Amino acid sequence: MLWNCIPEHFYKKDNDIECVILSPEFSGLFFRFGVLYNLKEMMIIDKYFMQKAIELAAIGQGKTNPNPLVGAVIVKDNGIIGEGFHEKPGEPHAEVNAFLSATEPVEGATMYVTLEPCAHYGKTPPCADMIIEKGIKRVVVGIKDPNPLVAGKGIQKLLDAGISVDVGILAEECRKQNEVFLKFIIEKKPYVILKAGMSLDGKVATTSGESQWITSKAARAHVHQLRNNYEGIMVGIDTVIADNPLLTCRIQGGRDPIRIIVDSRLRIPIDAKVLDMQNESKTIIATTHLADSEKIKALQGMGIDIIVTKSINGRVNLESLMTILGEKDIDSILLEGGPILNYSALESGIVDKVMIYIAPMLIGGQSSKTAVGGEGIRKLSDAIQLEEISCRAIDKDILLEGYIMRQITSAS
């Protein structure tokens, strides 16, 4: 009897190790600390290999925009014989890279892929066609692709070819990994993440305005990873004037995000660091008709992209701005705004996710700034609500993440 318990066939759950039994005499069973269990229709194996595909997809983080993150694993006799991920737009998809890496013939194998295989010709041929041609017998898909060009067509093509298809393995994990793509492909608007660092009592600066640094070095390093992952970074003019930031990614080999400055009256100093075009990062300034036309021309002459929106109470129309940025293929924005811009973003409904770094300190002071300012709300029933909350430690700080559940109503 063969007890095939090489590392590739271990599955960790609740701090226990499960080992899949590949002996034909015990097909459909697995071995866990001396006890035989049912596999429950291969669910355990499917989750294990889909998790592998998710991990592969993550390698492309920050490089595939506006394409999705996709990972693929080819499995034969319960062993991985090929794997791949989508690296960047215009290059082979995850399924193709998995085939290219295969160590043996793939005919009769199972493919695990985090997102439905494409069925249309774009910059690359349809992956569904290649899967059929290669003789794959079963495909396990994390989630369907909402792209109108795909939207179930890839799965249907596989089924029509007689291939067994299962959809929904680790679907929530696959969905969260591609939350940016899933919004952008449908709405053509950026996925917006509001990021802030604060004290335990919600302060982002002292009474004198000092804010560097409330959070730990480890938390700030994590923020630079976010800057590498997302397409754009957005701040208000008050942040530019107060801090004169570069708004770049400090990770070696990382990618600088597109810098987006919200400046309703075009108060930005000509010598601001974000206007330094020697950096590879592009700078966009969003303003209104209140801006000086000569200054607009001067900034455009420096290579700055100026977007003029209709104003709302003298401020940039953030909803319109998101539409314009989407047309520029900016699929995600890390909002590192001050209190006023953060409130405006929440009030306008453009924020999708909130990430708050909380430092173990108390600052106090009625005049100390908080992460969200603006007019605020009068009734708790109107307060913004978060769902799917998670938190974890980053050094001495806590990172709290949540998704916007509903929009706020202005106090007025």
Task: Indicate residue ranges for each PLM-predicted region.
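N-terminal amphipathic/hydrophobic targeting modules at extreme N-termini
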Residues: 1-9, 19-29, 33
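Secreted/luminal cysteine- and crosslink-motif detector
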Residues: 4-6, 20, 38, 119, ...
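Enzymes that bind and transform nitrogen-containing heteroaromatic metabolites
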Residues: 37, 44-60, 65-67, 83, ...
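Short, compositionally biased leader-like segments
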Residues: 39-52, 156-173, 359-361
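Proteins enriched for Cys/Gly/acidic motifs involved in redox and nucleic-acid/cofactor modification
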Residues: 63-66, 155, 169-197
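N-terminal glycine-rich anion-binding loops that anchor highly charged ligand groups
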Residues: 64-78
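Zn2+-dependent cytidine deaminase-like catalytic core
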Residues: 74-173, 258, 284, 289-291, ...
